[in-house]
Amino acid sequence: MASTKEIRSKIKSVQNTRKITKAMEMVAASKMRRAQERMRNARPYAEKIREIVANLSKANPGFRPAYMATREVKKVGTILVTTDKGLCGGLNTNVLRLIANQVRDLQEKNIEIAYTAIGSKGLQFLNRSKAKLISQTIQIGDIPHMDVLIGAIVSQLEAFERGEIDAVYLAYTRFVNAMKQEPVLEKLLPLESEALTPQEKTGNSWDYICEPDAESILNGLLKRYVEAMIYQAVAENMASEQSARMVSMKAASDNAKNVIGELQLDYNKTRQAAITKELSEIVGGAAAV
């Protein structure tokens, strides 16, 4: 049985660990709220672009934008969004499992895959897997900036425009609520025409005047729309990261509390046994005299 000194040392060590995990839990909760706000603020921008594109497409039914061009799929690109840091439970593991399944399924069809990594954890996974990597960006911080992301994602978008890639997928973790996050692998390009169908609304319809022409405006807006979707995915992934970290740190704090309770019980038993032994020795010595 460990001595009382050793047990006291263990209790102090676990208490210090619990202070750290509790602080990390509070920091993650604060960051999660800010990430949720950024996520909500990004949605109206993409929705407004979608609305304008839908109305312009309806007014120009014969125009087929480059981002909506469908062709036989021989090579795909995937933008993988993960975290830069750990301590967020199985968040990255779940989305990387989707990527592993995608690789297996596409290899069976002899379809090539080219990846873009956003986040250190995904980059490490792709390097270990010896996957084809065409661009990357890591250490993007707690606040995503489009000027940081654009350098990595433009490689995929331009490859699709040139016909070098026939489809682009986006893998990330969707934020549902503070206790639930879902790994997602969804098709980004080509855009589905149904997704850009204008919603039926009562009231006046917009009549746009386009300069230099509607086709140029549509192509430009669609690119901004796709970029906004990627930004939204990164924002959701960050909110998911902080919520998962908050839950993980809370679980760690609760476990530390339980361990401290068990160690305190062991300490009391050990101390009681030592006192009983001393009393027995005193009584035995007195009887001998």
From Swiss-Prot:
Cell membrane listed as a keyword: yes
GO molecular function, one term: proton-transporting ATP synthase activity, rotational mechanism
Subcellular location per the Swiss-Prot or TrEMBL entry: Cell inner membrane
Domain of life: Bacteria
One annotated Gene Ontology cellular component of this protein: plasma membrane
Gene3D superfamilies: 3.40.1380.10, ATP synthase, gamma subunit, helix hairpin domain (1.10.287.80)
Lipid bilayer topology: Peripheral membrane protein
One Pfam family this sequence matches: ATP-synt
Gene Ontology terms: biological process: proton motive force-driven plasma membrane ATP synthesis
Keywords, in A-Z order: ATP synthesis, Cell inner membrane, Cell membrane, CF(1), Hydrogen ion transport, Ion transport, Membrane, Transport
Family that this chain belongs to: Belongs to the ATPase gamma chain family.
Reported function: Produces ATP from ADP in the presence of a proton gradient across the membrane. The gamma chain is believed to be important in regulating ATPase activity and the flow of protons through the CF(0) complex.
Alphabetical list of HAMAP family matching this protein: ATP_synth_gamma_bact
Quaternary structure and interacting proteins, as annotated: F-type ATPases have 2 components, CF(1) - the catalytic core - and CF(0) - the membrane proton channel. CF(1) has five subunits: alpha(3), beta(3), gamma(1), delta(1), epsilon(1). CF(0) has three main subunits: a, b and c.
Name of this chain's protein: ATP synthase gamma chain
